[in-house]
Amino acid sequence: MSQSSTVYTTLADVKDALQIEDSIDDIAIQAAILAASRQIDEYCQRFFYQEGTLLAPATRYYTPVSPWYIETDDIVQLTELACDPSFEQTYDQIWNITTPPLDVMYEPVNNPQKGWPWTKILAIGSYVFPYFFPQTVRVRGIFGFPEVPYEVELACKIQAARLFVRKQSPFGIAGSVELGTVRLNSRLDPDVEMLLKTFRRNKGLAY
């Protein structure tokens, strides 16, 4: 997973949570927000921003689980699926993903209606996945999440505030009216873990 400058909360939200009105510590708070965002990515083993666009899609390579499907990283929109059945790194078998009858189906099928990405592609048309060689499937498109979930935004605000106040709390305890008392340590705040538990998945699958 590549590092990103995308963050999941704002400077204003964290300052409001900490009841800070001046701008003296803005740079330090912004650094805490960035660190908290990447901690969330690592904990969930996925990211909540988007990589790639329709004009400049991102590329991933996968090893099929079976002839019938591949498990993928989070996909918002697919722009190309190509396979390399001869294992010559040509990826010249281009699947139909635009005009019915399609060669693919996406799962979980209802995820877009819930604001979630797809994580599996099924072969339902003219081809099967060449599963006997590794990295024989090339997928291009937009990866990540359609929008940052509210729970992730809130988790990032809490975690960023905790990281910022840590340097000011030599006894390991800090707090504010909004955040309450927070015990500071090297792991995510328990409230943050609770907010994020629904979003955790296995380690990224792209090669």
Which sequence ranges carry the predicted segments?
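Divalent metal-cofactor coordination and adjacent catalytic microenvironments
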Residues: 1-207
